[in-house]
A protein has these predicted regions:
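Active-site recognition of the HExxH zinc-binding catalytic motif
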Residues: 81-98, 104
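Short acidic, glycine/tyrosine-flanked loop/strand segments centered on an H-E-D-like triad
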Residues: 62-88
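Metalloprotease/metallohydrolase-associated module, dominated by Zn2+-dependent proteases
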Residues: 1-72, 98-164
């Protein structure tokens, strides 16, 4: 599979997530079905903004819609790469990689292997602050109060056949 071309063809967050799942399966040999994506205004973290978080022992990835919309509107050429980076990071948490440093390293290793050194996804994984200087990663147990979640329809397409 040509991952750069596949990511470039992605038209939506569910499309990007399909690339994330294939990439993780190829690189770490694990998959996880039945995940949901919720968009929410996560506000600001004391050190910057959060891209997303995964609720440990759940099936929900919560993605901060404010930077997502801002990137789409002001830097559309980075939108898919940002979404891939953030969704891959949280998907790896869902696969059991809860240590932040280990998870970040895995995101870089996977991006480098599948996209190559010069690809934007790899460059973001190498140094996310170069592209998004205010992005921070919360502790694994962090959760904001008073979340208003907006679920993304058809997010985990390959794993919903059992739902009536």
């Amino acid at each position: 599979m040509n991952f750069p071309e596949t990511l470039e063809r992605a038209d939506s967050l569910p499309d990007v997530f399909e690339v994330v799942k294939l990439a993780a399966e190829q690189h770490v040999g694990r998959t996880r079905g039945g995940l949901m994506l919720a968009l929410a205004d996560l506000g600001n973290h004391p050190r910057g903004f959060l891209g997303a978080f995964y609720v440990i022992a759940s099936n929900v990835i919560v993605m901060n819609k404010v930077p997502l919309v801002r990137i789409r509107d002001t830097q559309p050429h980075l939108y898919k790469h940002y979404a891939f980076h953030v969704l891959l990071h949280e998907y790896l948490h869902a696969l059991g990689y809860v240590d932040e440093a280990r998870c970040r390293q895995l995101v870089f290793d996977l991006s480098h292997t599948l996209f190559g050194e010069d690809h934007t996804a790899t460059q973001i994984a190498r140094d996310v602050t170069r592209f998004f200087p205010n992005l921070v990663y919360p502790d694994a147990a962090w959760q904001p109060a008073d979340l208003k979640l907006e679920l993304v329809a058809n997010f985990d397409r390959g794993n919903t056949g059992y739902i009536a």
